[in-house]
Amino acid sequence: MDERRTLAWHETLEMHELVAFQSNGLIKLKKMIREVKDPQLRQLYNVSIQGVEQNLRELLPFFPQAPHREDEEEERADNPFYSGDLLGFAKTSVRSYAIAITETATPQLRNVLVKQLNAAIQLHAQVYRYMYQHGYYPSYNLSELLKNDVRNANRAISMK
C-alpha cells in the first residue's frame, strides 16, 4: 500500500465520530469527577480521563491530513455541547437497541424493543435537525465538521 498524504473520506468520517464522541465524554468525565467521593472510583475516573485525553492527542495530528480546507475558528457556547451529547446518546441508543433485538428470542420483548428502537431513531432525527438548523452539526461541510472536532477536542483536553 502506498503512503497517502490525505485520509480517505470514510476513515475521516470514522475519526470524526470517535473524536466527537470522546470529546463530549471527556467533558462529562471532567465535570462528574468533581462529584465523586469514593477514592477508588475517583481513581478510575482519573484513569479514564487520562486515557481519553491521550486518545484525542493521538488522533488530532491526523486532522490536517483530512480532505478539507482550513477555515476561521469561532467561539462555541454550551448548546452545541449539550445537543452533541444528546445526539451521541441517541445514536448509542439506536445501536444498543439494534444489538439487543438481534439477541432477543421472546416475541413480546422483541416488539417492545422495536418500538423503543423506533423512538430512539426519532429522537436522533430530532436532535440532528436541531443541531443542523443551529449550525452545530454542519454534516454537509466536512471541513467545518472536522474543524469543530479539533476545537472540541482541544477544549476538552485543556479543561480543568
Curated annotation (Swiss-Prot):
Annotated keywords: Sporulation
Propeptide: 1-4
Compartment list: Spore coat
GO BP terms in the entry: sporulation resulting in formation of a cellular spore
Pfam family, one: Coat_F
Keyword S-adenosyl-L-methionine attached: no
Domain of life: Bacteria
UniProt keyword Glycoprotein present: no
Misc. comment: Present in an increased level in yabG mutant spores.
Protein name in UniProt: Spore coat protein F
Lineage of producing organism: Bacteria, Bacillati, Bacillota, Bacilli, Bacillales
Gene: cotF
